[in-house]
């Protein structure tokens, strides 16, 4: 076993959830996105959901879209997320938070689907604006 393999296996060497979340908060510039303390709290929760997924070994399964999915597949999508997608997820959450029974699961799935869903949502808005 080389030192890199040992470092990966040694949990104390890997970043913690809070360290990953702090890095995500900087990446997504959540202090710029948030218009008030409530939104800031929501953006931090979203970053926390992402961070919890990022520490799971890639070969493990997690539930996304009510289906077992490799954590590595979810992580690959999460690594490509942008501030715009994070903001879109937050807006969707605020619009239906009273109907969401498990916020953590909802966020995990919505984040995973956000690249395609956000694009479809924008396309539908354009078609609606054009009377289509």
Predicted regions and their residues:
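Electrostatic interaction modules used in gene-expression and signaling proteins
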Residues: 1-132
